[in-house]
Amino acid sequence: GLPVLDALLPLDCALFRKSQPWRFYAGPTLALELSGSTAWLAGHANPAELAGFLSFCGCESAILDDATCSPPDGWRKAETLTVFGLPQAGLLPLPAVDEALWTQLTLCREASAARVAAALYPADLTRQADFYSELCTKRSRGRAVAWTLEQESAVVCTVGAYALCNGQAYMACGQTAEPLRGKGIGGRLIVEMANSLATEGLRPVFLCAPERVRFYTRLGFAKLAEYARYVPEK
């Protein structure tokens, strides 16, 4: 199946098809999820019809596999998104970290949804509330996990797997507090989670923006596929 898309779309549709701000559409050859102003597409459709539909929906970006899905007419590629996962050899060695700092941190594998949301979206209360609701809904059904590193009860690093579905674990929202970046704690946490998910029989996958490709390659993750993010021509 398609990495990321085959985890995210079916799970979100099953849990949120009657919920705002999600909208889902399925045609004979296309599955489409709208979340906020971003569309996720799997399959293919007529490019002119797709452009009209996305415009009608107020969509500002679309993530798709342009090897199989022609982009909407009048849209341009904004960036290539790399899909990463574990290499065929299996689990990754834990990367180097500032050991003195690491020993001060507490790993929480059942992190508070409210605290994860606040750490990720401190200035956006609406996004914070949406994220909190989504995480609680998924986690109560065993479909998501969120980990944090905490220092004196403050969340300083987090990563999660926010769609456990169809044998995949879609990892996202890795973030380290600004003062502690560059010390290796984010990379260590991401590798630990990916290895843990793999030992549970899941296939960890995640999408990576161009500026982060070197970081994940250095950690030892393998490129599995490429998707593209398209935006309307202004």
Named regions from a protein language model:
Residues 1-9, 80-84, 88-131:
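Short amphipathic alpha-helix that is part of the acyltransferase structural core
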Residues 2-61, 156-172, 177-178:
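Conserved donor-binding loop and adjoining core beta-sheet/short helix segment
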Residues 31, 35-100, 105, 208, ...:
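Acyl-donor-binding surface of acyltransferase catalytic domains
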Residues 46-53, 172, 176-178, 182-199, ...:
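Conserved acetyl-CoA-binding loop-helix of GNAT-fold acetyltransferases
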Residues 72, 215-217, 221:
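Conserved active-site tyrosine of GNAT-family acetyltransferases
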Residues 127-175:
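A conserved beta-strand-loop-helix scaffold within acyl/acetyltransferase catalytic domains
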Residues 171, 203-208:
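Conserved hydrophobic beta-strand within the GNAT/NAT acetyltransferase core sheet
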